[in-house]
């Protein structure tokens, strides 16, 4: 079972502290500190803290504004299916990590990837990453930068005339350099969109099947219904069918099977 999360500037701090088990007073009472040594990381080893690397990566990409509600980081939580034999655990999480890296731009966008084994229930992977999309730099900025590289002594009047753009635009970009031309941008909206969410479980299942890892993370429910139904929605549907009678035994049985799959961490 997998679920997606998005984190604004303030939520990033608590999330990274949580996954690294550095929160002094964690809200999650299910954490057994005596088992925390069993947790492990799949993220690349770096000489930077997670916060330092996040800042470094954000400096490399275009960010439209600094609003408080912008999502600076996204994340997936993937839980090991109950029926998966323990000997496949590390291979399963490594495969999930590789799948996520391939899907979201590679290791350079990974902030953390921690497998937790110190909570109740099955082990699970917290995969946190910067949602990076393709960016098309401002055309006039590129023009000004390239022109001034070739004509460093040109004044604003000359640049305006030869480039065919306004004097205001030349002044705006005059002090920019190649570092300001960014072909990547921060955009959780573009990366974690409806199509991505709807295809996620099925794509992950195909990847695991290709590696012959006997884990079920997709049952076809998403495809059949156009989106995952919550446990509460399924229970309400089942109870409605039972209450109103009719030949609904098979339908109720099907819904019960789906609920069992939720309980087992399959979907």
What positions do the PLM features span?
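N-terminal nicking endonuclease/strand-transfer module with a His-rich metal-binding environment
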Residues: 1-150, 154, 158-168, 172-267
């Amino acid at each position: 079972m997998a679920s997606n999360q998005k984190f604004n500037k303030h939520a990033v701090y608590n999330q990274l502290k949580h996954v690294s088990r550095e929160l002094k007073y964690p809200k999650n009472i299910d954490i057994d500190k005596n088992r925390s040594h069993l947790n492990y990381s799949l993220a690349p080893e770096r000489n930077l803290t997670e916060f330092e690397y996040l800042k470094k990566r954000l400096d490399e990409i275009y960010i439209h504004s600094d609003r408080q509600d912008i999502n600076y980081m996204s994340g997936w939580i993937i839980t090991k299916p109950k029926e998966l034999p323990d000997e496949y655990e590390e291979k399963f999480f490594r495969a999930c990590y590789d799948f996520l890296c391939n899907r979201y731009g590679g290791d350079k966008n990974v902030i953390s990837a921690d497998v937790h084994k110190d909570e109740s229930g099955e082990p699970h992977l917290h995969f946190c990453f910067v949602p990076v999309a393709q960016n098309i730099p401002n055309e006039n900025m590129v023009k000004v930068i390239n022109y001034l590289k070739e004509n460093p002594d040109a004044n604003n009047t000359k640049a305006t005339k030869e480039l065919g753009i306004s004097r205001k635009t030349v002044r705006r970009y005059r002090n920019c350099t190649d570092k300001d031309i960014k072909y990547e941008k921060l955009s959780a909206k573009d990366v974690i969109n409806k199509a991505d969410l709807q295809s996620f479980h099925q794509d992950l299942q195909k990847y695991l099947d290709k590696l012959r890892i006997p884990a079920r993370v997709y049952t076809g429910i998403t495809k059949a219904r156009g989106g995952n139904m919550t446990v509460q929605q399924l229970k309400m549907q089942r109870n409605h069918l039972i209450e109103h009678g009719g030949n609904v035994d098979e339908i109720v049985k099907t819904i019960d099977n789906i609920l069992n799959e939720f309980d087992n961490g399959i979907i």
